[in-house]
Amino acid sequence: MGSVWSSPERPAYPHQALAVVLQVRARRLHAMLWERPNEPFAGAWALPGGPLLPGETLGASVARQLAAKVEVGHLGHLEQLETRSDPGRDPRGRTVATAYLGLVPTHVDPALPDDTAWHPVDALPTTAFDHGSIVRSALARLRSKLSYANVGFALAPPEFTVAELRELYVAALGYDVTATNLQRVLLRRGVLEPTGEQAPPGRAGGRPAALYRFVTAQLSVTDPFAVFRPPVRKPPGDGADA
């Protein structure tokens, strides 16, 4: 039996590298998309990406594709997300795509090309191919990792108050978390540390809030069995009698 590499039936499908780049902007989680000028899906919004070149690794390819849209150094984290191989995902012919998840911290405001913009993940425009579904997969990955890993470092500025960090987690998770519980959990896991400094006082005055930072900007699993869950809301009328 001949080798698959010498077989005339050896597949020769184009392989693409795509990137889902997320950032919390104005208290909402956004995805970076670009508007396609040509068919298929002219006028629809797509993820940054393109074909894998000969001799190029997937990691090198996604970095090259991203460089056309955003300064790669702005990313706080980049990891491989998933591979899509549905035969019908591209009307021009079969393609395989490997998607990456990238995160940009809030203190960075990258300059984007004219065809590229940030869109709230909970209100995406019409997307090309299966890119809307890939964004949803990236969102699920991020929410899962916020529960068991320290990936919040890639969304946060170098220093922050607990209230500011809570806003980032609420935007990314899609539901409310209390600042007190978030602080308690992350300190217990050894993820946060106080800087010893305080934030400038607000307009209302009061005691200045303490500043914190993530202990490391390297991804690590801090609690493999942990899961953040949305608060349980009791149905109306389900309470103790007065």
Regions found by a protein language model. Give the residues of each.
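Core subunits and conserved enzymes of cellular information-processing
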Residues: 1, 5-6, 24-26, 31-32, ...
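N-terminal strand-loop-strand
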Residues: 6-45
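Active-site segment of metal-dependent pyrophosphate-handling enzymes
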Residues: 13-20, 30, 59-63, 67-111, ...
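Active-site-proximal cofactor/substrate-binding loop regions of enzyme domains
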Residues: 39, 47-48, 55-58, 62
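NUDIX/MutT-family hydrolases
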Residues: 99-102, 110-146, 155-163, 168, ...
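Short helix-coil junctions and helix-kink-helix linkers
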Residues: 167-176
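Long, intrinsically disordered, low-complexity Ser/Thr/Pro-rich regulatory/activation regions
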Residues: 194-242
